[in-house]
């Protein structure tokens, strides 16, 4: 997917990319490739791959969830900024908080935000389980996002404690979602979430299945969750 195909594909979904936004994506790509030589940010470094499998793929969440109606977003395990920073570029009003367990990536994200002129972004080093217990972050965000971080049964315990009641958890997943949703049903219920809907589609020009899962936060998460760091992955709820 080249730049023009990227713009056209988003326009087909009702999303217009301005010249300024296109420049931001271009700079994002250049910095990602440059810094990837210093640290492991992504296995995908060719321009068409980055535009399709990182930028476009991140923004697909906005095809099924209306980011114009929310203000605060927390992205768990964003790595090199996906999905939240491409979403932030497209929806500049958003206040984005990223939590990532690797401090080197936080350094990259701080530099990236400065270079792209992104305002209303904050980057925090640590584990989602720790932030889910922190009163400053717990049940604070309109939307919590995550892309390819863990299976739903684990991901729910990372993300739902951070979403406010009335907010949403939006997960960007790859193939074979049905089994994950079955496994994760108990976790969603225990943690105060209700599955609203899931959407399956393919990336343009590829037979790569993708899924967007939207979970409504209906009830407060019980105080004992999230459990201590590492426990959700070792012993998923359900």
Curated annotation (Swiss-Prot):
Annotated signal peptide: none
Enzyme Commission identifier(s): 2.1.1.-
Single GO cellular component term: cytosol
Binding site for S-adenosyl-L-methionine: 77, 82, 128-129, 147
Compartment list: Cytoplasm
Family listed: Belongs to the methyltransferase superfamily. RNA methyltransferase RsmG family.
This protein's name: Ribosomal RNA small subunit methyltransferase G
Species lineage: Bacteria, Bacillati, Bacillota, Bacilli, Bacillales
